[in-house]
Amino acid sequence: MSILEHISSPADVKTLSYEQLDTLASEIREFLVEKVSATGGHLGPNLGVVELTLAIHRVFSSPSDPIIFDTSHQSYVHKILTGRAGAFDTLRQKDGLSGYTSRAESNHDWTESSHASASLSYADGLAKAFQLKGEKARNVVAVVGDGALTGGMCWEALNNIATGTERNVVVVVNDNGRSYSPTIGGFADNLAALRMKPSYDRVMEQGKTTLKSLGWVGERTFEALHAFKEGVKSSVIPTEMFPELGMKYIGPVNGHNTKAVEAALRYGRDHKGPLIVHVVTEKGKGYAPAENDVAELMHSTGVINPKTGEPVGTKSPGWTSVFSKELVKAGETRKDIVAITAAMAGPTGLSAFGEKFPDRLFDVGIAEQHAMTSAAGLALGGLHPVVAIYSTFLNRAFDQLLMDVGLLNLPVTIVLDRAGVTGSDGASHNGVWDFAVAGIVPGIRIAAPRDDENLKELFAEALTIDSPTVVRFPKGELPSRLSAQQRFDDGAELLHYSDSDHEDSTPSILVVAVGSLVSSVMEIVSDIEECGCNVTVVDPRWAVPVAPSIVGLAADHELVITVEDGIIHGGVGAMINEALNASEIDVPVRNLAFPEVFPEHQSRNQLLDAVGLSPRGIKTQIIAAAESLYLLDKE
């Protein structure tokens, strides 16, 4: 029986010998490869924190001592040690184990959001709460890495943590030099310098021993070289980077030596007061396919062959790949086009552009706020920046979008990947807020393509507009192409109009279908017609602002249905309601959109079905709306 099979709580690892811990670490890595390869998930980050997580749970007393994992995609080992190994077959599945920490799963999990750079602020607040409640013996551990320290929020938190000299906050910097791809920026360079220090000091120590063995001449030579060494070291190695904030610093420590990490953490626990433990780890450690994945070290994978690391099944081209190719084409013809990524060039489709135009791709780290205002600066300088981020991360840069881009009416194109429902990535990764968030920026235009050809057209149009634009598309494979019957002057397209054979008295329904849900609407049009209604389907293409042609069409129908994969409050449907009211058009409207909830993780199709936005759900809601207005007889 393996050691892992005996682990059901953190207490079980506290009594193990270091030899047993090494065996357990190997067993955990084998377990992770087996389970994550079958479900998909964040494999590389978790392979890199096995010994670190073991040491944390041996030194601290979870859940009394909160352990906060920044982004928490590297919390799989933590889940294993807190009794959840048996649920890993359900990882990221409906009603199964979350891919991030989850308060519903365990009292060992204190947070749930998977947005980066927030852990230190949580830790600061928890430590203050414990201090005010007189719970001085409790520690707070924040594990931050995978590029999260490139986010400004971490430094805002550190500035506050450092002032709490009587608050027990241990900040573990999990330094693997990566986010998705290699971490960039001045802070990353500083950590690299700190990583360099131990070997540098070992060489100097050897030199000291040799020179002193030569008598007084050697001693004088050593003194001169020592003074030179200190001057060089202070200029290239930022040893005061953390102490200058008022925090004790320990490290770098080999993150794959459990004994060494444990010793550093015990010192941090007993130190009393804020402290940094700098741990150097290798993302993907122990699994050759991950170690050989130079680009991302298997940061996140789908279902893979555990022996080879290769994806299982054939992967069809997705939305991101179409955008990626179109951006490169645009860059070839226009030298003013530049691109910005917040540490996610690969996932957002910017890598190809960066390879072709390395001087025109700017990776700003996990810093969406800075990315947006930097884009504003590029636009002020006469360029047309394309900011490519996940839809859910646009929320982090709203003030910059509103005041630094919108207020100046600058030609910045924001491309939102993973817009709408994403599903298995969990509540905080769904991109359902972008219409409501970006839509209130005066003068902004938001495009929602329905297929690949539509995406190409709309992205090209966005690059010709001298004001802020957004192009949003979902995660996953592309739907079949849908041709339009007519394009109106404002860009909206008529996709379906019921046959003229129907009698004039037949009830008529206008369906405004947005983006990725257009194909779902078209799938059920004939079913609605068979129930006895004429149906008109229009795709606005540019969903914001509301196209005048849609307002005009609404006046000619007895019921308007809007269908979108964004939040219902403040979404496209709500904007159409306002436009109709402003034009004094009195027609019933039903908005089919994502409800105001944080949903549990499940597949995209499962989630769409759960909220009534699958083809079946859309059909049911349209028929119910028509029946409620007596446009159809109730069966």
UniProtKB/Swiss-Prot annotation:
Cofactor annotation remark: Binds 1 Mg(2+) ion per subunit. Binds 1 thiamine pyrophosphate per subunit.
Cofactor (UniProt): Mg(2+); thiamine diphosphate
Top EC class of this enzyme: transferase
Entry keywords, A to Z: Isoprene biosynthesis, Magnesium, Metal-binding, Thiamine biosynthesis, Thiamine pyrophosphate, Transferase
Enzyme Commission designation: 2.2.1.7
Residues bound to Mg(2+): D146, N176
A molecular function GO annotation: magnesium ion binding
Subunit structure: Homodimer.
Function statement: Catalyzes the acyloin condensation reaction between C atoms 2 and 3 of pyruvate and glyceraldehyde 3-phosphate to yield 1-deoxy-D-xylulose-5-phosphate (DXP).
Protein's UniProt name: 1-deoxy-D-xylulose-5-phosphate synthase
Gene source species: Corynebacterium diphtheriae (strain ATCC 700971 / NCTC 13129 / Biotype gravis)
Phylogenetic placement of the source organism: Bacteria, Bacillati, Actinomycetota, Actinomycetes, Mycobacteriales
